[in-house]
Curated annotation (Swiss-Prot):
This is Serpentine receptor class gamma-1. Its main location: membrane. InterPro entries: 7TM_GPCR_serpentine_rcpt_Srg, Nematode_SR-like. Keywords: Membrane, Transmembrane, Transmembrane helix. Belongs to the nematode receptor-like protein srg family. Signal peptide: none annotated. GO terms for molecular function: transmembrane signaling receptor activity.
Length: 288
């Protein structure tokens, strides 16, 4: 689809100090770049070097799916999303060549939003897997061995029920801090991506809270009846639940600020949402 030039900005925002914005980029790259390298190493170990060992444990299949998704999202941030936002010096060049970016944006933005949705689904599955380990220790291995491929396939297809509206819509460029941000101009009025994401995020929060609470209660009663290795994985999923809830809390606060039209605070909260998404992208690997 072509760039929507009517909705897109035609000039750069000069209200931000370029060097300050560059510093923001540098600070974010300081944790994003090592995280990308670390994620690539983990993916190599689990998917290739010791694949025979990890393939037997269905939990690590879910973990690998989360790592691969996070790795792609982190690289999107490093090589495109963040430089576009925090390098105001490139703003004029991008706007001058905006038409040449149409094909790239048609591929990048739907993929970016698809991966965000898929990651949330995988993280729901992540917590559900650990909860089932505690609740049904005798049968959970057989269940996940039988159904995991089908569940992951369903989860991989599910975001497409929403992504199509982004894929067919015009993309547009708007101001983001001193730089630019990619959005889309909705072509089908009733197909609202914000509604889909709200439902997905709400489902995620409810599932994570219920599963984690149930798991903690059950673990406190099981004592030594659960293997120490499984117990550690369960505690790891508790820590991950906190990481997964952070973006939900930040997004809710951001929504309230926009609804109240307190736009002077929206920039800070938008930055907080971005950081919380970074935490979600990389936390599972560091915790594990």
């Amino acid at each position: 689809m072509p760039i929507n030039e009517t909705a897109s900005v035609t000039n750069c925002d000069t209200n931000f100090e370029p060097l300050i914005e560059n510093l923001k980029l540098f600070l974010q790259l300081c944790y994003l770049t090592p995280s990308a390298l670390f994620l690539s190493r983990v993916i190599y170990i689990t998917a290739w070097k010791y694949r025979k060992k990890f393939r037997k444990q269905r939990f690590y299949t879910i973990f690998l799916a989360d790592c691969v998704t996070g790795f792609i999202l982190v690289n999107f941030s490093i090589f495109f999303t963040r430089p576009l936002i925090y390098v105001p010096q490139a703003c004029e060049f991008v706007l001058e060549h905006i038409k040449k970016l149409a094909l790239f944006l048609d591929i990048y933005y739907p993929c970016f939003r698809y991966l965000q949705a898929f990651q949330i689904l995988v993280q729901i599955l992540f917590v559900a897997n650990r909860a089932s380990c505690v609740l049904w220790p005798l049968s959970y291995s057989l269940f996940w061995k039988k159904w995991l491929k089908s569940i992951l396939t369903t989860m991989a297809i599910s975001p497409c029920l929403w992504i199509w509206t982004i894929a067919i819509s015009d993309k547009m460029i708007v101001h983001g801090y001193g730089g630019l941000v990619v959005l889309y101009y909705r072509y089908v009025s009733w197909a609202r991506s914000t509604l889909f994401f709200s439902i997905l995020r709400l489902t995620s929060v409810i599932t994570i809270v219920v599963a984690t609470t149930t798991m903690l209660i059950k673990m406190s009663r099981m004592k030594k009846r659960i293997r120490e290795s499984e117990r550690r994985l369960c505690w790891a999923s508790v820590y991950l639940s906190v990481c997964y809830l952070l973006p939900a809390i930040a997004e809710f606060e951001y929504f309230l600020v926009l609804k109240a039209k307190l736009f002077e605070n929206s920039g800070i909260l938008h930055g907080l949402v971005v950081i919380c998404w970074d935490i979600q992208n990389i936390c599972s690997t560091y915790v594990m």
